[in-house]
UniProtKB/Swiss-Prot annotation:
InterPro entries: Adeno_E1B_55K_N, Adeno_E1B_55kDa, Pectin_lyase_fold/virulence
Keywords, sorted A to Z: Early protein, Host cytoplasm, Host nucleus, Host-virus interaction, Modulation of host cell apoptosis by virus, Phosphoprotein
Chief localization: host cell
PTM-bearing positions, type Phosphothreonine: 491
Single Gene Ontology MF annotation: ubiquitin-like ligase-substrate adaptor activity
Biological role stated in the UniProt entry: Plays a major role to prevent cellular inhibition of viral genome replication. Assembles an SCF-like E3 ubiquitin ligase complex based on the cellular proteins ELOB, ELOC, CUL5 and RBX1, in cooperation with viral E4orf6. This viral RING-type ligase ubiquitinates cellular substrates and targets them to proteasomal degradation: TP53/p53, LIG4, MRE11-RAD50-NBS1 (MRN) complex, ITGA3, DAXX and BLM. E1B-55K probably acts as the substrate-specific adapter of the SCF-like E3 ubiquitin ligase complex.
Region (Disordered): 22-112
Free-text note on domains in this protein's UniProt record: Contains a PML interaction motif that allows the subnuclear PML localization.
Pfam families, per database record: Adeno_E1B_55K (PF01696), Adeno_E1B_55K_N (PF04623)
Record-given protein name: E1B 55 kDa protein
Effect seen on changing residue 268 to E: In strain: Grider
Length: 492
């Protein structure tokens, strides 16, 4: 420890006198500097309260002690002398300086800026602008011809301050810069076929309108090969505080490789033909919604921590998707074909339970929910892997056969009309539980939010276990038959 009242300022206990330090050799000078560094680090590890440290530093400054500045550990950190800084930052092997803080680039987008410049300067076979194609297709004959392809249209590189709607109407082929951040502050109406390449750019939805992108009915325009719909690809959408719908489409829409993060409402609402492929949905309320008479195609998409993944009221095709930590992966009200998907239920954390009033009864939304309908057929449900999920099956026409589905730790709720119309012959059924709903207990109703937007009272169902009544006898029906394997190539 240092003496309480040192007579020589700046020289700690154990050091030589100041006159002798000036005449010492280089090795002794370096040893003294290293000793000073160890003493400084030792003083910074002293466990002092903030009050004691403040009083001690004030008293030390008044008594002639060397001042010290407070460090992150709560103690005093001695200011380094220039000689000590050179010793600590000099490498012993290479001789170069080390431990020196270098200024970081404030933007941090050097790589993305280089990528943007590389994409903008790349040579492409682009020869004609969109307005030139429009001017050539004025008459009735040329408007039906496909004279140009997408590769021949010139690209308009959109800046963050540009108007999206005007650029789409005038250029049709749009590209975003990956080093820029775009913000949507008003509704964008799209009335012509277009091709928008995002290049991984981030688009923040910041508007009070009901829909951010409204894909309206398209007029008669000259055809371009490869641009027959409204196409958006490789765009990252964020909805910080946005409570509306991102895409409302009543025309043909293609979303390719986009990601949606943190939307409190519907991401894609389809009233026409919509194709969603290779997209990712993170922490969204409703990812995709196919309304009545819509044709929704969802392929190779990922749903994570969403409340409702796919809402289907019309026609839907769901292929090769993955869902995890999603309360309801698909709610089938219309006709659907669900094949080759991997559905993982929620973890130990219990999600918020919503209702659905479709089918005449208010039931808790299951991970896979099939609504009962007196005239609709069962959905095609094949080759799916379901783990730690719940299924709700309502009554429909025909027989429901989840062919070659792996149901591991799955609880299936069967409505009374669906009990005799479900066959679990061709599935992996070791850890499946089948329950039949007998009636609804109206003594303890609970009011919950519904997927329709309102709130309803939910009555507790009274169920009975019917697993062994529906499970086939595997000693009679062997698993070596043609149901679980075939010599031919399985096709989608």
């Amino acid at each position: 420890m240092d003496p309480p009242n040192s007579l020589q300022q700046g020289i700690r206990f154990g050091f030589h006198s100041s006159s002798f330090v000036e005449n010492m050799e280089g090795s002794q000078d370096e040893d003294n500097l290293r000793l000073l560094a160890s003493a400084a680090s030792g003083s910074s590890r002293d466990t002092e309260t903030p009050t004691d440290h403040a009083s001690g530093s004030a008293g030390g400054a008044a008594g002639g002690q060397s001042e010290s500045r407070p460090g992150p550990s709560g103690g005093g950190v001695a200011d380094l002398f220039p000689e000590l800084r050179r010793v600590l930052t000099r490498s012993t092997t290479s001789g170069q300086n080390r431990g020196i803080k270098r200024e970081r680039n404030p933007s941090g987008n050097n790589s993305r800026t280089e990528l943007a410049l590389s994409l903008m300067s790349r040579r492409r076979p682009e020869t004609v602008w969109w307005h030139e194609v429009q001017s050539e297709g004025r008459d009735e004959v040329s408007i039906l011809q496909e004279k140009y392809s997408l590769e021949q249209l010139k690209t308009c590189w959109l800046e963050p301050e540009d108007d999206w709607e005007v650029a789409i109407r005038n250029y049709a082929k749009i590209s975003l810069r990956p080093d820029k951040q775009y913000r949507i502050t008003k509704k964008i109406n799209i009335r012509n076929a277009c091709y928008i390449s995002g290049n991984g750019a981030e688009v923040i939805i910041d508007t009070q309108d009901k829909a951010a992108f409204r894909c309206c009915m398209m007029g008669m325009w000259p055809g371009v090969v490869g641009m027959e719909a409204i196409t958006l690809m490789n765009i990252r959408f964020r909805g910080d505080g946005y409570n509306g719908i991102v895409f409302m489409a009543n025309t043909k829409l293609i979303l390719h490789g986009c990601s949606f993060f943190g939307f409190n409402n519907t991401c894609v609402e389809a009233w026409g033909q919509v194709s969603v492929r290779g997209c990712s949905f993170y922490a969204c309320w409703i990812a995709t919604s196919g309304r009545v008479k819509s044709q929704l195609s969802v392929k190779k998409c990922m749903f994570e921590r969403c409340n409702l993944g796919i809402l289907n009221e019309g026609e839907a095709r769901v292929r090769h998707c993955a869902a995890t930590e999603t309360a309801c992966f698909i709610l089938i009200k219309g006709n659907a074909s669900v094949k080759h998907n991997m559905i993982c239920g929620h973890s130990d954390e219990r999600p918020y339970q919503m209702l659905t009033c479709a089918g005449g009864h208010c039931n808790i939304l299951a991970t896979v929910h099939i609504v009962s309908h007196a005239r609709k057929k069962w959905p095609v449900f094949e080759h799916n892997v379901i783990t730690k999920c719940t299924m709700h099956i309502g009554g429909r026409r025909g027989m429901f056969m989840p062919y070659q589905c792996n149901m591991n730790h799955v609880k299936v709720m069967l409505e009374p009309d669906a009990f005799s119309r479900v066959s679990v012959t061709g599935i992996f059924d070791m850890n499946i539980q089948l329950w039949k709903i007998l009636r609804y207990d109206d003594t303890k109703p609970r009011v919950r939010a519904c997927e329709c937007g309102g709130k309803h009272a939910r009555f507790q169902p009274v169920c009975v276990d019917v697993t062994e009544d529906l499970r086939p006898d595997h000693l009679v029906l062997a698993c070596t038959g043609a149901e679980f394997g075939s010599s031919g190539e399985e096709t989608d």
